[in-house]
Each structure stands twice: as C-alpha cells, then as structure tokens.
C-alpha cells in the first residue's frame, strides 16, 4: 500500500475531524464525502469503529500499515499500557518532533525536511523520518538550510508549545526533553480501540 497523497480534505471529512490541521472544507461540509455523505448511515459494527480509529491514527501520523503494526508490536512489548505506549512512540518519531517544534507546518512537510537532509540530531544529519528520539536529544536545522524561507516562516509563526519539548527560534534548535505522558498528547485518538482491533 502506497502512502496516501490525495486530497486531505476528503480524509478529514471521512473522520469528521481536522486531522491534518484546520480545514475549511470540513467547516463547510461536516459530513463524509461522496453521494450519500449526508444521508443517515446505519450503525457501524464494533470492528468498523476500531478499524476507523486505526486508520485515523495512521493518517494523522502519516504511517503505512507495516510501519504502524511494527510500532504497535514494539509498544506491546513495553511495560505499561500498550495503547498509551503506542501514542508515545508515535510522538517520539523525528518527523513528528520536527512538526511539534514548529520547524515544519505539517507532518508531511516534516518528513520532507528530514528526507532532504535539512534536519540534524545531536549535530549529525539524520534523514530517517521514523528515527526514534531519546530524552535530551537536540534537534536543529542544518546551518546551510537555516536560510530557507519556508523554514524561517514556519519557525517565526510557531504558536503551540509542548511540555516535553524546548525550542529556541533564534538558533533554530530544540530539545526533546523526555517522552510525553498520554494526557499531554493533544490528538483526539481512542487508542484502546486500536489495541482491541489488533487483539482479535
């Protein structure tokens, strides 16, 4: 299965949530796309609800099925609540960290920045979006990339801050302080549904 590159508005309308950020299309048409989007739909099965939650999470973080399942398997081997560990591992990806720090406007853009070698971790270029952050890792924009207008604009307009991250706009450098707690992660995801799906 290839990574989805189609209209993000359709995905947001399917899940009735702005999973890629503010969506004017969702505001105008807060119902699923398609000919029968506004019609009353029959009650979804338990499996359908669980599958939809998994798909929503995959789209939110930009993962393919194999990547997502591998991360779930890793979370299931960790001590603690599997669903919470899954979300924490998703948040600890380098592409997500670049997005949360405001270096990139979207996770898709963050993946591009990483893949195009604009991002450094502990002063070494890392071009793997799935790279897992560790506490006290320092993320920075490569010096030769700091003059890119798109990155400068993103950093300048960064608004949200997160307790597990530090960011110095002037230096274009931030720190992954520690793994976030579940309650600190703002995504509207019911991770227990995903655990139940994979437990079948």
UniProtKB/Swiss-Prot annotation:
CDD domains: S4 (cd00165). Residues 92-154 form the S4 RNA-binding domain. It holds the Pfam family Ribosomal_S4. Gene3D superfamilies: Ribosomal Protein S4 Delta 41, Chain A, domain 1, RNA-binding S4 domain. Keywords: Ribonucleoprotein, Ribosomal protein, RNA-binding, rRNA-binding. GO terms for biological process: ribosomal small subunit biogenesis; translation. The keyword Lipid metabolism does not apply. One of its GO terms (cellular component) is small ribosomal subunit. Part of the 30S ribosomal subunit. Contacts protein S5. The interaction surface between S4 and S5 is involved in control of translational fidelity. This is Small ribosomal subunit protein uS4. It comes from Salinibacter ruber (strain DSM 13855 / M31). The gene is rpsD.
